[in-house]
From Swiss-Prot:
Name of the protein: Ribosome maturation factor RimP
Keywords: Cytoplasm, Ribosome biogenesis
One GO BP: translation
One Pfam match: DUF150_C
InterPro entries: Ribosome_maturation_RimP, RimP_C, RimP_C_sf, RimP_N, RimP_N_sf
Family the entry assigns: Belongs to the RimP family.
Main location: cytoplasm
The keyword Protease is assigned to this record: no
Cell location: Cytoplasm
Main function: Required for maturation of 30S ribosomal subunits.
Keyword flag RNA-binding: no
Organism: Clostridium acetobutylicum (strain ATCC 824 / DSM 792 / JCM 1419 / IAM 19013 / LMG 5710 / NBRC 13948 / NRRL B-527 / VKM B-1787 / 2291 / W)
GO CC entries: cytosol
Length: 149
């Protein structure tokens, strides 16, 4: 279903001049939310979110790709944005990231450091003691910008 939603939503977002960053369906407090994250070079305003939300909402009503009720949310990925894709990871090489692991690696499940390399197998960061630390991608649960630019 996510692929179908991307197929519907991405062209609308891009035609309005925004970057389609990510989409997710989440369940919180018994309610479902379709979250669409958009971006642009100078940041996203509330007006930008409203504009995209109106355009997407009309199209989703017409196509009706989700078989249950949900709330549509359009927002910026934020300063502490999650890096979901290979493109996101490569774009933010040189920035500080926070990494949460699925299981412990060297007695920790949380790491922070400057992202210096991304490849098929590993993410490489420089940690606080200036050593390079290689983290297997298969162990990563979530990777976000830390806000320290």
């Amino acid at each position: 279903m996510i692929d179908k939603l991307i197929e519907i939503i991405r062209p609308v977002v891009e035609s309005l001049g925004y970057e389609f960053y990510h989409i997710e369906i989440v369940k919180e407090d018994g309610e479902r939310y379709l979250r669409v994250y958009i971006d642009k070079e100078n940041g996203i305003s509330l007006d930008d979110c409203e504009k995209v939300s109106r355009a997407i909402s009309d199209l989703l009503d017409e196509k009706d790709p989700i078989p249950y009720s949900y709330y549509l949310e359009v927002s910026s990925p934020g300063i502490y944005r999650t890096l979901f894709t290979e493109e996101h990871l490569k774009k933010y090489i040189g920035n500080t990231v926070d990494i949460k692991l699925k299981s412990s690696l060297e007695k920790s499940t949380n790491y922070s450091g400057k992202l210096i390399d991304v490849n098929e197998e590993d993410i490489v960061i420089v940690v606080s003691d200036n050593r390079e630390f290689k983290i297997p991608r298969k162990k990563i649960k979530k990777i976000c910008l830390s806000g320290e630019f």
